[in-house]
């Protein structure tokens, strides 16, 4: 008996122009052309995104039958997006078409192993769009492919049917004893059951079968965090990042853990992997800047915070961090200038107003600071820090 029959896996939605499609492509013109052409073909194009990370968030919230994604999406590129869709228990993946440059044979094989259902090679011929999507969907729903069985197992996890999920993953393991992926699934089931030792055992089985399985190392790190094994968790995070150095979400998860444990220098080392790999994301520069600020290395902190702000000039959080850094470095005039720039955009931002008042106090401009603190309280009457600071400088 095949696994589809054994577990009563529902039949897939038949292919038609009514299927929902998400387009994720960094080039605006190509993204809009694809969206327009797909709509003309009758498909429901419910979102178009230029960021892989945003595309993933959209797909977690509103799954698509088919995803068309570019290989050069910022932060989370096409293959990384697919891997996240395959591995994340909260995600329901559909057919996946990768927009890519011409690939060497080994590159194409790696993409197929990652789960790509079909390719469209740049420059894209729109006449190929319908045949490629049709082929990709047929490949995804092919009963000889285990993908829908893995998706069924994930659906059991999402509905807290842990025994059902475990049974499917065990059957997948029996059908392919050399496969690493079922053991990651079994580790997730054990982790939800708070069986951390069993989860670690299963994820180690996965690593033994495939040492380059990035999500096995990432899950191992998550398990070790729960076991409060900080050093081992850091090593597992580092391994996952070295295998997949261009996935920004891996750095976000790792940095949250390291900084929570006050591992500042370890955080810098991890983030520098991204810089060396050429990852262009303001998160990397901002977090390195934060780490150097924590180490009181203000020149380096300013360098990276400025870099983050150049990449994302609309991010007033980055600007506020830079202003605080300048303040602590003794560059008070520059700090005030940065706060003024923020307040031109967000004139009622009372935390920024408060921070500006602190700098003015350091400049012995207490009357001006007092006016700003009173303005803070007008905006936020329960802002206790502003009340206390007014008392400290003797203004009622």
Stretches with model-predicted labels:
Residues 1-22, 26, 150-154, 389-396:
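Non-catalytic signal-transmission and effector/linker regions of two-component phosphorelay proteins
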Residues 17-30, 34-38, 67, 157, ...:
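Conserved acidic segment of CheY-like receiver
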Residues 52, 68-85, 92:
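Conserved phosphotransfer microenvironments
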Residues 43-51, 58:
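Short hydrophobic/Thr-rich beta-strand motif most characteristic of the beta2 strand and flanking loop
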């Amino acid at each position: 008996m095949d696994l589809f029959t054994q577990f009563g896996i529902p039949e897939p939605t038949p292919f038609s122009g009514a299927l929902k499609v998400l387009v994720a492509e960094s080039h605006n013109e190509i993204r809009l052309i694809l969206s327009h052409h797909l709509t003309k073909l009758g498909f429901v194009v419910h979102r178009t995104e230029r960021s892989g990370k945003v595309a993933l968030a959209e797909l977690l919230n509103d799954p698509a039958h088919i995803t068309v994604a570019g290989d050069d999406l910022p932060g989370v590129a096409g293959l990384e997006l697919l891997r996240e869709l395959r591995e994340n228990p909260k995600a329901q993946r559909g057919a996946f078409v990768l927009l890519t440059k011409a690939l060497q044979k080994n590159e194409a094989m790696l993409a197929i192993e990652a789960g790509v259902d079909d390719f469209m090679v740049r420059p894209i011929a729109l006449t190929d769009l319908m045949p490629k999507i049709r082929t990709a969907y047929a490949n995804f729903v092919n009963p000889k492919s285990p993908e829908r069985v893995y998706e069924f197992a994930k659906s059991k996890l999402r509905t807290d049917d842990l025994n059902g999920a475990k049974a499917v993953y065990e059957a997948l393991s029996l059908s392919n004893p050399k496969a690493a992926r079922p053991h990651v699934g079994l580790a997730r089931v054990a982790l939800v059951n708070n069986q951390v030792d069993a989860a670690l055992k299963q994820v180690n089985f996965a690593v033994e079968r495939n040492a380059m399985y990035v999500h096995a190392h990432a899950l191992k790190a998550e398990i070790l965090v729960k076991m409060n094994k900080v050093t081992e968790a850091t090593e597992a995070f580092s391994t996952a990042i070295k295998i997949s150095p261009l996935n920004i979400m891996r750095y976000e998860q790792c940095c949250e853990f390291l900084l929570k444990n006050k591992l500042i220098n370890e955080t810098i080392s991890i983030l520098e992997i991204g810089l060396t790999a050429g990852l262009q994301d303001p998160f990397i520069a901002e977090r390195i800047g934060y780490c150097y600020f924590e180490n009181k290395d203000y020149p380096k902190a300013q360098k990276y915070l400025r870099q983050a702000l150049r990449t994302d000039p609309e991010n007033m959080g980055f600007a506020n961090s830079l202003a605080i850094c300048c303040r602590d470095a003794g560059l008070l005039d520059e700090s005030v200038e940065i706060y003024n720039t923020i307040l031109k955009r967000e004139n009622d931002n009372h935390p920024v107003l408060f921070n500006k008042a602190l700098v003015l106090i350091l400049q012995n401009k207490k009357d001006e600071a007092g006016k700003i603190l009173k303005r803070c309280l007008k905006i936020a009457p329960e802002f206790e820090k502003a009340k206390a600071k007014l008392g400290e400088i003797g203004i009622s």
